């Protein structure tokens, strides 16, 4: 039986495909639906499509070159490879040190030292008979990998330094005469300057109350607000200096102005002093309505107060607070009252008239002269704040000042209430670091006035956030010359700086000059300024010269 063979079932049939003809270019005219959502990126066969697994190298280097496996042919990055760290397997690990039993502590210490050849007595090791090792805190300070060294070495600059403002704006018509840098001034010396000779003494002093020597942290006393007038009179407005300038001396100033110049190498903030040369006489003045008489706070600190005027801890608000505290403390520690004895100098207070009925602070004025050589005779007004009655009956004159604590955490200092009674030396050392210029000025003023004692009070805020209420935590007294030695204050260098500036001015022609501390550099500049500079305020007042000494401060009513 014959079978019929179906050739169509054995062999596949061929269907002619439909080819689209693209008249405008090459390629299909329409995109099939199956390839419509597939992304496309131009590529080259030479591009690396991935990275082989490498377990030997660390992944830190790949962070810097994350795109080195990206396609270099096209601009897209759909198929680029990125090496990312998988944080899903991240776990916290307890790194707390396991406390070893006492018998296992230091078990292999000697063995390790002996192997390395740097044991206690080995060369380069620790010598038990020599210098003691530094503590961990000091080692960090010395190690360049810690603190500031790391920033300078590895490029971490930190915050930019603060740019302080100048005490006075330098005008275009001022001519710069001389620049004196601090390294040069520190090397100056004028030895063998004798004690000043009294010319005139004025004012009335009250006696010191010794009960304040028994105040401590546990027996603190509130600081009172004393309603008394303090005169802050500049040199040329002083009627006594005007009278003495006709017969005695050729250089005239006040103790505050002299202390600012003599301690200039310790200052960081800007200040200025006006100098007038008339013939062979030189008058050193402060400008009116300035902050010259305000006491700085933490001027020499590593972290000075922030420049935020709205805060009570800004430099200006702290200066007003410190001046307020200093005035009230110097008057509170005295025996006040009509029945209490007083020490009167030869002349009365030159800044008040007999018909005035005002409460004046206890201040004694000494007008003294010094021979500085080369026919230079200095005449200055110095001040005492109080007097102390000794068992022998001889009075001892005192310079009374106050240090204030505002916020130990912000000031990077020690807490007085914890350390003042037990470690007073540490508290004073911290104040010497933070207020080196202010303490040096007080010491120079006490030495110039010839005070027998420098009394320092420690005044703190009741609450660090309340700058209006304070308490007295203790007192401490020093002899001015001994205290100058303790704080490394050389009076020979101080006299040398003053003499250097006097010699520079003496070489100039008659006129008005200004010396100013640069706000951001350890430099003092001497300017030649026009004669009418700073005279606009005085001419507007229309007051005579006799009324110039009426500038006063009443700190009890100042708002701080």
UniProtKB/Swiss-Prot annotation:
What does the UniProt keyword field contain? Cytoplasm, Initiation factor, Phosphoprotein, Protein biosynthesis, RNA-binding
Has the keyword Cytoplasm been applied to this entry? yes
Role noted for this protein: mRNA cap-binding component of the eukaryotic translation initiation factor 3 (eIF-3) complex, which is involved in protein synthesis of a specialized repertoire of mRNAs and, together with other initiation factors, stimulates binding of mRNA and methionyl-tRNAi to the 40S ribosome. The eIF-3 complex specifically targets and initiates translation of a subset of mRNAs involved in cell proliferation. In the eIF-3 complex, eif3d specifically recognizes and binds the 7-methylguanosine cap of a subset of mRNAs.
Supply the gene name.
eIF3d1
Which family does the UniProt entry place this protein in?
A: Belongs to the eIF-3 subunit D family.
Q: What is recorded about the protein's domains? A: The RNA gate region regulates mRNA cap recognition to prevent promiscuous mRNA-binding before assembly of eif3d into the full eukaryotic translation initiation factor 3 (eIF-3) complex.
Subunit info here reads: Component of the eukaryotic translation initiation factor 3 (eIF-3) complex. The eIF-3 complex interacts with pix.
Q: Name one GO cellular component term.
A: nucleus
Region called Disordered, residue ranges: 98-166
> Where do the segments described as RNA gate lie?
291-305
| Phosphothreonine carried by residues | 128
Q: What is this protein called?
A: Eukaryotic translation initiation factor 3 subunit D-1
Q: Where in the cell is it found?
A: Cytoplasm
Taxonomic placement: Eukaryota, Metazoa, Ecdysozoa, Arthropoda, Hexapoda
Q: Which GO terms describe its molecular function?
A: mRNA cap binding; translation initiation factor activity
The protein's organism comes out as: Drosophila sechellia
Among the GO biological process terms of this entry, one is: regulation of translational initiation
Q: InterPro entries of this UniProt entry? A: eIF3d
- Name the residue ranges with Basic residues bias: 100-121, 147-156
């Amino acid at each position: 039986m014959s079978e019929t063979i179906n050739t169509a079932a054995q062999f596949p049939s061929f269907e002619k495909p439909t080819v689209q003809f693209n008249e405008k270019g090459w390629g299909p005219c329409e995109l099939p639906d199956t390839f419509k959502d597939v992304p496309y990126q131009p590529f080259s066969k030479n591009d690396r499509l991935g990275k082989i697994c490498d377990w030997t190298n660390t992944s830190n280097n790949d962070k810097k070159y994350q795109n080195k496996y990206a396609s270099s042919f096209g601009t897209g990055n759909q198929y680029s490879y990125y090496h990312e760290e998988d944080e899903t397997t991240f776990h916290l690990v307890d790194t707390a040190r396991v406390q070893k039993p006492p018998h296992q502590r230091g078990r292999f210490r000697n063995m390790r030292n002996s192997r390395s050849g740097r044991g206690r007595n080995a060369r380069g090791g620790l010598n038990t008979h020599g210098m003691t090792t530094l503590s961990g805190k000091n080692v960090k300070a010395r190690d360049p990998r810690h603190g500031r060294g790391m920033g300078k070495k590895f490029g971490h600059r930190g915050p930019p330094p603060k740019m302080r403002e100048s005490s006075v704006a330098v005008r275009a018509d001022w001519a710069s005469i001389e620049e004196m840098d601090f390294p040069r001034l520190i090397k100056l010396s004028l030895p063998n300057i004798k004690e000043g000779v009294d010319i005139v003494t004025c004012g009335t002093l009250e006696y010191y109350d010794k009960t304040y020597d028994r105040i401590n942290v546990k027996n603190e006393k509130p600081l009172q607000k004393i309603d008394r007038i303090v005169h802050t009179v500049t040199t040329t407005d002083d009627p006594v200096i005007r009278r003495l300038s006709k017969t005695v001396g050729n250089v005239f100033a006040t103790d505050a102005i002299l202390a600012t110049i003599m301690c200039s190498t310790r200052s960081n903030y800007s200040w200025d002093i006006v100098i007038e040369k008339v013939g062979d006489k030189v008058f050193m003045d402060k400008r009116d309505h300035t902050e010259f008489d305000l006491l700085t706070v933490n001027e020499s600190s590593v972290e000075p107060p922030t420049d935020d005027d709205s805060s009570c801890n800004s430099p200006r608000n702290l200066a007003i607070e410190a001046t307020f505290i200093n005035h009230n403390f110097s008057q509170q520690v005295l025996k006040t009252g009509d029945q209490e004895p007083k020490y009167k100098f030869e002349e009365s207070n030159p800044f008040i008239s007999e018909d005035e009925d005002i409460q004046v602070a206890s201040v004694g004025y000494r007008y003294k002269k010094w021979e500085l050589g080369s026919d230079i005779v200095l005449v200055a007004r110095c001040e005492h704040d109080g007097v102390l009655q000794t068992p022998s009956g001889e009075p001892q004159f005192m310079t009374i000042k106050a240090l204030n604590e505002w916020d130990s955490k912000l000031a990077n200092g020690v807490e007085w209430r914890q350390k003042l009674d037990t470690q007073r030396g540490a508290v004073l050392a911290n104040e010497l670091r933070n207020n080196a210029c202010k303490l040096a000025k007080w010491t120079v003023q006490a030495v110039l006035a010839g005070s027998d004692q420098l009394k320092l009070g420690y005044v703190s805020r009741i609450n660090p956030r309340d700058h209006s209420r304070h308490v007295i935590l203790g007192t401490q007294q020093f002899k001015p010359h001994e205290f100058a030695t303790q704080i490394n204050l050389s009076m020979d260098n101080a006299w040398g700086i003053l003499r250097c500036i006097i010699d520079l001015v003496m070489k100039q022609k008659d006129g008005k000059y200004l010396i100013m501390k640069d706000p951001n550099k350890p430099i003092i500049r001497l300017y030649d300024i026009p004669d009418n500079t700073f005279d606009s305020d005085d001419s507007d007042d229309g007051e005579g010269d006799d009324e110039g000494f009426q500038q006063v401060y009443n700190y009890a009513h100042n708002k701080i």
